[in-house]
C-alpha cells in the first residue's frame, strides 16, 4: 500500500508557501485547487520533481444523497496536469 506523501506548494518565485499531502500528486493538487489556487506547482518532498497543474474550482449543486446540513451549492475542484519539471537544486 502506498504511503501518503507530502507536496510543497511553490509560488512563481520558487518559495514554498504551503504543504499538501496525498498518495498521488493529483490528490494534493485537488486539495490546493479547493483552497483557490489556480497555478499549482507541487514539489514532492525529498525529490527535485515539480508537478505542474492548472486548477479551478466551480460551484455545483449538492448531490441528491447529501446530508441536510450541507448547503445547496458546494465547491468542486478540478485540475489538469501540464507536466513535470526537474529542479537543479531545491
UniProtKB/Swiss-Prot annotation:
Keywords: DNA-binding
Molecular function as annotated in GO: DNA binding
Presence of the UniProt keyword DNA-binding in the record: yes
Signal peptide coordinates: none
Any single GO BP term: DNA protection
Record InterPro entries: MC1, MC1_sf
Function: Protects DNA against thermal denaturation and modulates transcription.
Protein name: Chromosomal protein MC1c
Source organism: Methanothrix soehngenii
Amino acid at each position: 500500500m502506498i504511503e501518503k506523501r507530502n507536496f510543497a506548494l511553490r509560488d512563481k518565485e520558487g518559495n514554498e508557501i504551503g504543504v499538501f499531502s496525498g498518495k498521488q500528486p493529483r490528490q494534493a493538487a485537488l486539495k490546493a485547487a479547493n483552497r483557490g489556487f489556480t497555478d499549482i506547482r507541487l514539489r514532492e518532498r525529498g525529490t527535485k520533481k515539480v508537478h505542474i497543474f492548472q486548477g479551478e474550482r466551480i460551484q455545483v449543486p449538492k448531490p441528491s444523497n447529501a446530508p441536510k446540513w450541507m448547503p445547496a451549492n458546494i465547491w468542486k475542484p478540478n485540475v489538469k496536469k501540464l507536466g513535470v519539471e526537474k529542479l537543479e537544486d531545491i
